[in-house]
């Protein structure tokens, strides 16, 4: 066991990225069933479609899984309400400041992880109270950071 496996209650310290268009319930549940942490990517989903994916994921696995939510999502209030209503226990946030939603999620018993592209963003995420950060360099798809992963 290590800190990652303990935090997420998973067998292996492997986390599948919450990629827009590619990370629905099928991939998330497969990764979770294999012992990692699967993530549903909410970024391209309408709120009710996300609800369906969460419900299908819960039927497909009894293992932990999470949802990745870009902070710039236009219907973020509805998305966060669905996450809470459906009992999701892990949320990864990205593409914006997690400060607005971190307290709300943590008050509901949800583990919050923020994806950052620089050390300064990591410090801001820490100040916001997230449980962990994922550092991604400019090599990662869909991210605007200027630093490589090796310098983070």
Describe the predicted segments one by one.
Residues 1-152:
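Active-site entrance/lid segments in N-terminal catalytic domains of soluble metabolic enzymes
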């Amino acid at each position: 066991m290590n800190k990652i496996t303990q935090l997420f209650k998973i067998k292996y310290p492997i986390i599948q990225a919450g990629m827009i268009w590619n990370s629905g319930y099928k991939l998330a549940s497969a990764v979770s069933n294999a012992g990692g942490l699967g993530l549903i990517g909410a970024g391209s989903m309408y709120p009710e479609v996300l609800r369906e994916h969460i419900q299908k994921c819960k039927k497909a696995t009894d293992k932990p899984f999470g949802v990745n939510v870009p902070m710039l999502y236009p219907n973020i209030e509805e998305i966060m309400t669905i996450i809470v209503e459906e009992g999701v226990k892990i949320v990864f946030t990205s593409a914006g400041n997690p400060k607005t939603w971190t307290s709300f999620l943590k008050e509901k018993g949800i583990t919050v992880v923020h994806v950052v592209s620089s050390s300064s963003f990591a410090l801001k995420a820490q100040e916001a109270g997230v449980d962990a950060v994922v550092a991604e360099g400019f090599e990662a798809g869909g991210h605007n950071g200027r630093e490589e992963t090796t310098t983070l």
